[in-house]
């Protein structure tokens, strides 16, 4: 029997439309826990260490926006970090799904929540049997 882990993260905010943050996004990453990714994680940590980032937790938003500790890091160095993360993600046996709402077409938080809820519930209904089959 498999165990499916679902990691959920959001990006953006429910606030008014802003060209710097035009979307509200909810992402789900699906990982079958019977597939061990420890070696992949160790490899990523080693690669980050080799470019000067030992024990480094990657948060893409601050890297892209040059925030916090990434403020003084030049474009090429930030790109190297992101490329390591992209390569790591591509090789993993995971799947993901993104749900988003373009905020310029939204009246209020209730509409944002409603549109996202509809997308997520439709996805779950469509994939429900797949989720059950994985658990058998």
What are these regions (language model features)?
Residues 1-136:
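Phosphate-ester processing/binding pockets and catalytic centers
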